[in-house]
Amino acid sequence: MRKKVFVSGCFDMLHSGHISFLENAATYGDVYVGLGSDQTLFELKGRRPVNDENERLYMMKAINCVKSAFISQGSGILDFSEEIKRLRPDIFVVNQDGNIPQKQKLCEEQAIEYVILNRLPHEDLQIRSTTTLREIDKMPYRIDLAGGWLDQPFVSKHHQGCVITMSIAPTLEFNERSGMST
């Protein structure tokens, strides 16, 4: 009988680095994936996911090397702790980024082998992470509260990028309606 291998993560913006990690984990046995919920992702990373939990679950289940996947019901960094007790995996596989003392301790308490994988890309591909993908797509912006388009050439010499221009003016209606004094 093949061993049960557990992995956890958000797996938002699914990319070749995720697939390579899952394929490497599958060399240890059948892979079971605990996905962080949208709420957990927001709590841990301070942002909403690009793909919601149902879409991430659908994509994860479609990967050939994944035996089963589920959305973890807990919260925080060990959001999967109840599920791991029910699943009773033989091995918990993490990459270097996911290697934290809390996971090691949980594995010691549950008598689960703890394996740390290096981040290795599939042959002929570069190392990929969600963070690097987000950096590629990052659009620099600045807010111009001063001169509007007149200062654009000067400001662009120092920091290029999109500009959000806004005008700030008192709104008496808001102040009167909310009972605030002016």
Describe the predicted segments one by one:
Residues 135-182:
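ATP-binding N-lobe of GHMP and related small-molecule kinases
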Residues 1-134:
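Nucleotidyltransferase catalytic core that binds NTPs
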